[in-house]
């Protein structure tokens, strides 16, 4: 997790396309690159 709330919002308040892994704005309904509707928020916790 980031040290500052502003940095955390900038880094993690993003949606990721499940099909092409493109970054999208948090208000997006579909992917900006491929048009896919399956979007998830970027993971806030590290894996592993």
Swiss-Prot record:
Q: Which Pfam families match?
A: Zn_Ribbon_1
Q: Give GO terms for biological process.
A: translation
List, in alphabetical order, the Gene Ontology terms for molecular function in this entry.
Answer: structural constituent of ribosome
Report keywords, A-Z.
Ribonucleoprotein, Ribosomal protein
InterPro entries annotated for this entry?
Ribosomal_eL40_arc, Ribosomal_eL40_dom, Ribosomal_eL40_sf, Ribosomal_zn-bd, Zinc_ribbon_dom
List the GO terms this entry assigns under cellular component, sorted alphabetically: ribonucleoprotein complex; ribosome
Family of this protein: Belongs to the eukaryotic ribosomal protein eL40 family.
Q: What is this protein called?
A: Large ribosomal subunit protein eL40
What organism is listed for this UniProt entry? Methanothermobacter thermautotrophicus (strain ATCC 29096 / DSM 1053 / JCM 10044 / NBRC 100330 / Delta H) (Methanobacterium thermoautotrophicum)
Give me the gene this protein comes from.
rpl40e
């Amino acid at each position: 997790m980031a040290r500052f709330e502003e940095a955390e919002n900038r880094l993690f308040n993003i949606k990721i396309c499940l099909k092409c892994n493109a970054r999208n704005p948090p208000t997006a309904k579909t992917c900006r690159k491929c048009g896919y509707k399956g979007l998830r928020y970027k993971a806030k916790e590290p894996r592993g």
